[in-house]
Amino acid sequence: MIVGRPDGRPLVVAHRGASVDRRENTVEAFEEAETQGADWVELDVRLSADGVLVVHHDAHFDDGRLVRETPADEVPDYVPNLAEAFEACGGMGVNVEVKNLPGDPDHDVSDQVCAAVAGLVAAYRPTDELLISSFDISAVDRIRGTDPTLPTGWLVVERHGTDLVLDRVVAHGHGSVNPWDELVDESMVVAAHQRGLRMVVWTVDDPGRISQLADWGVDGIITNRPELARRVIDGRLDGTWVDG
């Protein structure tokens, strides 16, 4: 489960790795994220035609092929499988985002990707260095149903109202809520923590906003710019950061 540092600093979570400086969701992006001081990496997984978890955001590769219809040995060279991605993330925690939304061209109603994720991740990270999330709450429900020890969180992008969202996360037994930055104010952070939830906000690259979220006590900040986020968060404590 994603937990902020003991000194109160939120964790820096590199969005698809150091995605400003390297190609997103690649071994190079994950390695660069650790070099830039990220605590965690967020990455996306989909299932190949032969049931291998591959790390890719979109349903299609750049050449137009559908990930779900492509065998693992035919995916582009830059696309790692999930096991390779875990290895590339070194000592960082990993937030695995499951991509299987209704309406996606590769949507699988049987949620085979969830079973595959649940069967693999525990071999690569202890639960305190792992979070599995999805925009589809039924996907993380399936993960939790397969292995209740795996930390899970719901990614939220729509404006349903704070109480409704947070109460739904609690009712489904998930430990984390991962809202879009534009939904977040201080009262939402307080309300989440009052319910015993962790909050991981995405995707934040503005230094002033990073500092504000840290002031509010969020547990993690997903960012495309881990080096910047690291400087802002650490500088708030030692007095070296000046906004603007």
Each model region followed by its residue ranges:
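Aromatic/hydrophobic pocket-lining residues that form the small-molecule binding cavity
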Residues: 26, 78, 82, 114
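Short amphipathic alpha-helical segment that frequently serves as the phosphate-/nucleotide-binding helix
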Residues: 24-31, 44
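Short loop-to-alpha-helix "cap/lid" segments that border enzyme active sites
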Residues: 2-7, 89-94, 98-244
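Hydrophobic transmembrane alpha-helices
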Residues: 18-20
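Functionally critical loop-and-helix segments that line ligand-binding/catalytic clefts
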Residues: 15
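An active-site metal/cofactor-coordinating segment within enzyme catalytic domains
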Residues: 2-12, 35, 39-40, 45-92, ...
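N-terminal beta1-alpha1 ligand-phosphate binding loop
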Residues: 32, 46, 223
